[in-house]
Amino acid sequence: MSTHGLQVQGISKRYGDTVALADMSFEVHPGELFGFVGSNGAGKTTTMRIALGVLEADEGQVLLGGRPVDLDVRRRIGYMPEERGLYPKMKVGAQLAYIAQLHGLSRAEAADAVHRWTTRLDIAHRVDDTVSALSLGNQQRVQLAAALVHDPEVLVLDEPFSGLDPVAVDVMSHVLVEKCEAGVPVIFSSHQLELVERLCHRVGIVRAGHMQAVGTVDELRDRGTTQLEVHAPGAAPGWADGLPGVRTVGVRDGRTVLELLPGADDQAVLAAALRTGPVHSFAVRQSSLTELFREVVAA
């Protein structure tokens, strides 16, 4: 298995007066799951299509292992588009074998790969059905099999979990983790931010064609504000008002949620809470990726 990483270096793309991408740069390392998140129209799909070589960037380049993406490199990429990219009236098995052979596998190698991946994705019993006869979830499984059937050196997946039931989400998650553990760089976009937070090593947040933030979830948390949750049952409303660098966000499950600006003293907050009576809990609240995403795109 290749240990090549995927490098996106300063790519820009315009459509007339519309800027789709502006100096988009990031890297997906070998054996890394990279989550690519952003609102609709932020530039995720355009970036992925340029990475695959389907679209040409106006500026910048995409490299796999230091080599520009040409026809030979494209054959080594597994791509799963958000929209269905399969022939609806063609049988599943024949279609996957055809795709495998397009990527350079022999007829026998393609047959073995089709059997392996349809079994792994629990669709082996549907290989003689047409794609149009399948549920949307099973069509999504076939689409993933099409991205995997040629044993790619990098995976680029656009909304791979869309429309899947929880069992299918687990199957697909396990497959992506396995490919990652084998050294494959995996990038996928998703609006299911809880899933991205659970699976990904690093996350890139895109807004209006720009990479706004990139890093581990913990690194993204360090960029934002710190929140405290304080359970002081005897405290009157507004008990933290006036503390330097402290803003009351609200009350959640009986606990006061406070936002600390840089330089604020959490021990001063604890002392103020203790002056109101017993303090049952006092803890830093970890922001979810969904909350971090809102902070970044609203900045």
Protein language model regions, located:
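C-terminal coupling/interaction segments
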Residues: T3, L261-A299
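ABC transporter nucleotide-binding domains
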Residues: T3-L6, K13-R207, A213
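Solvent-exposed beta-strand sheet faces enriched in polar/charged residues
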Residues: Q9, H231, A283-R285
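Alpha-helix N-cap/helix-start and coil->helix boundary motif
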Residues: D70, G93, L193, C200, ...
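Short, flexible helix/strand-to-coil boundary loops that buttress conserved ligand/catalytic motifs
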Residues: V73, R221-G224, V296-V297
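Structural motif
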Residues: R84, P244-R247, G277
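ABC transporter nucleotide-binding domain
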Residues: V171-L260
